[in-house]
Regions:
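A general structural signal for stabilizing positions within well-ordered secondary structure
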Residues: 7-10, 49, 98-100, 127, ...
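Conserved AMP-binding/adenylation subdomain of ANL enzymes
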Residues: 30-59, 66-107, 176
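Short strand-turn motif at the edge of the Rossmann-like AdoMet-binding core
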Residues: 61-63, 87-88, 112-113, 141, ...
Length: 191
């Protein structure tokens, strides 16, 4: 079995990287051609701004047909960190998902509020606390004060960051780091 290594061609930041689709909220879903530059820019900002490192353990919980999957795959790979991918049967079982997060020492989670509620329910069922969690990056829907408070109980060390972005603006165009000591009656999308 011979191995032949060939040189890869250089990638221009303006070249298309992937195609993703809008939700179709204004009618038919539209295909969006995303270039390399915004994703690379986001990943560089994300890893540096939040001090993400090769020692972190990332979860890949995004659906494979949803554009956050690019963030969930390429962020950890860009810094040499581990990416943990649960079985689908684990993702839909709150107790199994809580056990999986704890067992794998997950430190970075990107999640939607409904997924957060699933994790919180599983943690409650298991009596689990996630001391290894460093960051919870929220997006995709409004983060309620009640869910924020419930997640503070099960992940007391985690920094909570609310992301906002659209399909047309890859990954996040605004963010807000939630201050646990502030009045968080309404958690902003960010700026």
């Amino acid at each position: 079995f011979a191995f032949h290594q060939s040189a890869l061609s250089e990638v221009d930041p303006a070249h298309p990287a992937y195609i993703t689709f809008t939700s179709g909220s204004t009618g038919e879903p539209k295909g969006i051609v995303a270039t390399h530059a915004p994703l690379v820019h986001f990943i560089e900002w994300h890893t540096q701004h939040h001090s993400l490192s090769k020692d972190d353990c990332f979860s890949l919980l995004s659906g494979l047909g949803h554009d956050p999957v690019y963030r969930d795959v390429f962020t950890p790979l860009s810094i040499g960190a581990k990416v943990f991918i649960p079985a689908q049967s684990t993702v839909i079982d709150p107790a199994a998902l809580a056990r999986w997060i704890h067992k794998n020492g997950i430190s970075i989670v990107h999640l939607t509020p409904p997924l957060g509620k699933l994790i919180e329910t599983g943690a409650k069922l298991q009596g689990a606390r996630f001391s290894a969690l460093r960051y919870l990056f929220w997006g995709g829907d409004a983060l309620s004060l009640s869910l924020y408070e419930q997640m503070r109980v099960i992940a007391p060390n985690a920094v909570r960051v609310n992301f906002y972005g659209t399909t047309e603006t890859p990954q996040a165009m605004a963010y807000h780091r939630v201050d646990p000591d502030a009045d968080n009656a309404r958690i902003p999308l960010g700026r």
